[in-house]
Amino acid sequence: MRQKTLDVLEFEKIKSLVANETISDLGLEKVNQMMPATNFETVVFQMEETDEIAQIYNKHRLPSLSGLSKVSAFIHRADIGGVLNVSELNLIKRLIQVQNQFKTFYNQLVEEDEGVKYPILDDKMNQLPVLTDLFQQINETCDTYDLYDNASYELQGIRSKISSTNQRIRQNLDRIVKSQANQKKLSDAIVTVRNERNVIPVKAEYRQDFNGIVHDQSASGQTLYIEPSSVVEMNNQISRLRHDEAIEKERILTQLTGYVAADKDALLVAEHVMGQLDFLIAKARYSRSIKGTKPIFKEERTVYLPKAYHPLLNRETVVANTIEFMEDIETVIITGPNTGGKTVTLKTLGLIIIMAQSGLLIPTLDGSQLSVFKNVYCDIGDEQSIEQSLSTFSSHMTNIVEILKHADKHSLVLFDELGAGTDPSEGAALAMSILDHVRKIGSLVMATTHYPELKAYSCNREGVMNASVEFDVDTLSPTYKLLMGVPGRSNAFDISKKLGLSLNIINKAKTMIGTDEKEINEMIESLERNYKRVETQRLELDRLVKEAEQVHDDLSKQYQQFQNYEKSLIEEAKEKANQKIKAATKEADDIIKDLRQLREQKGADVKEHELIDKKKRLDDHYEAKSIKQNVQKQKYDKIVAGDEVKVLSYGQKGEVLEIVNDEEAIVQMGIIKMKLPIEDLEKKQKEKVKPTKMVTRQNRQTIKTELDLRGYRYEDALIELDQYLDQAVLSNYEQVYIIHGKGTGALQKGVQQHLKKHKSVSDFRGGMPSEGGFGVTVATLK
């Protein structure tokens, strides 16, 4: 992509803002290298990278990259035999520490966001090498400033000797400076250091009272810094030990440098990956600052930017506009007043495309769509000055000639005030001819103009659309709103009237313009009104769609919660049943044990095999913990609406209300209506019955699966319940619903106590929320 285009569209300012978000020189280097890609797959991948990291950044607290720095130069120096110092080793240690923290963060992220995939970050984490040994070797050998005393046995011994010798020197010198006889002879009662030797400050006139070596004197010459002869040999010993210490430190650092050289390839990979992460996190931070969104890239030529705004303008005051090249539109011509925002619209389009192809989220609403352009060409300059000289026209024409040489069908071309700076009639003619040529090349074009001739340009050419920037006549100022499909119109008469020009003058002026031009202005005015009306309706439609989507999401979540609740209740019921069977089984075992003892003691004739067989039947009643039952579906006729079926997964009867498609049907089970897989349904065969039983069967079919006792007195309710249960048993119902309402709870308690004693009821439970909750009791019949 041309550097001139990047400069005109101020891409460097965007890069500078992203650079401000980096932590390390690694990330900064990658920002400085950031350029728009032109390969489709590369552009898509870069956007996926940024979007994934942005999603993580917006939801989680990322590990700190503080202290991360470029270390490749140190690694290369280690590889060729150089020796790294403690500071350089610490930067390498920090690199390893940061990458390990990111590994830990990613592992926690995978656990927290179970089921969510992060392929980009996963790939980068898999690239990171294992450098634990090198980290420990550096960490155990030195701190931020120096090697530890225990970095080696030799170093520890040397430093121990230095410490003890220093202590002896101090003790010796302390005796001298604290001596009462020496107080008046010393400038200060302290021990100091000159030329790495321990000395005392002696007044010049008492020099002869102290044997030793003079190492320095004060600026006035009144103080001499003397190393007393009593500590000269000890100071010499310190110097020898310091030399030994330096040699040992060099040996240790050489050893550590060798470890670094051995892991050079792994370290370079770690540096590369962590630099990429710093770069991507900086992109994510910047994207959040502009509320950026991810565009959808398409192979076919597409530009759709809903509510786009220029990212360098104040987000609070800038007017966002939808910029769109509708189907089959290749050229958009924007007309309207100067300073109305036409140039900003051009720059917004160009800059957003460059940002998107550089892997940056863009300042639009969700749903933007773009194709990938091989190049963006623009001719945008100082056309908004009042006077435009010939040199200005020549400069722009030179730029346009250069654009026409290189533009092709994969290019986006932006012309600002095309043809301006010369005679209006010639400028308009040139503008139309240039647009025709670019359209022939196949480039996508957006151009601004104030020539009225170009308003009619789209009328006799396919693929051309007019647009305009709105002007508020009441405030005499532009609104900066872009009206796609509506050409700009002259507001001279309205503005003049607003400013107080005589109506006679205005009316006379109107008679001087042609009828065609008057009709065009009226048509444009009508288009503006229609555009605003349609735009208002579109915004309302968007709002309703979003509300509908939200309601759908909420209902889906509630349905899922209901299903989970239903499953938990069924599992709980089965668990209770299993516990009862387990208790009965244990009791049977105890009885069998007692009978065996009785038979052995008294020789009683006990048929143990019959007892064991009956005990085994208890095991057959154990409920599987899973809701789904392992029932082999029998093959009957095709299931249609109205069929009675058995729902295999729940073991319940139901009626098919509707066949949704080849795979699903809506089934009524009692008062529950559910969408179920057809393969989970077994059509119940109609029994062949004798004619004498026909009346009985018809009566059964009239019995509902629910009994409403609300409004009944207590005694009447129980009588009605008894009659209903008898009829339900005759109708072969497996489960019925007793509606007693909530009220004081007396009727509910009475119904449930009655059910507990009833011979035909095997179990009962309270209703689920979808079944009526506490106002319903569900009874299972034997």
UniProtKB/Swiss-Prot annotation:
Q: Which GO terms describe its molecular function?
A: ATP binding; ATP hydrolysis activity; ATP-dependent DNA damage sensor activity; endonuclease activity; mismatched DNA binding; ribosomal large subunit binding; rRNA binding
Q: Where is the Smr domain?
A: 707-782
Question: By its UniProt entry, which SMART domains does this protein fall under?
Answer: MUTSac (SM00534), MUTSd (SM00533), SMR (SM00463)
**Key word Cell membrane present:** no
Instruction: Indicate the segments annotated as coiled coil, or none if absent.
Output: none
Residues that bind ATP, according to the entry?
A: G336, P337, N338, T339, G340, G341, K342, T343
Q: EC class of this enzyme?
A: hydrolase
What are its E.C. numbers?
3.1.-.-, 3.6.4.-
Tell me, what is an example of a GO biological process annotation in this record?
Answer: negative regulation of DNA recombination
**What InterPro entries would the database entry show?**
DNA_mismatch_repair_MutS_C, DNA_mismatch_repair_MutS_core, DNA_mismatch_repair_MutS_sf, MSSS, MutS, MutS2, P-loop_NTPase, Smr_dom
Cite the entry's keywords alphabetically: ATP-binding, DNA-binding, Endonuclease, Hydrolase, Nuclease, Nucleotide-binding, RNA-binding, rRNA-binding
Role, per record: Endonuclease that is involved in the suppression of homologous recombination and thus may have a key role in the control of bacterial genetic diversity. Acts as a ribosome collision sensor, splitting the ribosome into its 2 subunits. Detects stalled/collided 70S ribosomes which it binds and splits by an ATP-hydrolysis driven conformational change. Acts upstream of the ribosome quality control system (RQC), a ribosome-associated complex that mediates the extraction of incompletely synthesized nascent chains from stalled ribosomes and their subsequent degradation. Probably generates substrates for RQC.
The record's listing under PANTHER family reads: OS10G0509000 PROTEIN (PTHR48466:SF2), OS10G0509000 PROTEIN-RELATED (PTHR48466)
**Quaternary structure annotation from Swiss-Prot or TrEMBL:** Homodimer. Binds to stalled ribosomes, contacting rRNA.
In Swiss-Prot or TrEMBL terms, this protein is called Endonuclease MutS2
- Gene field: mutS2
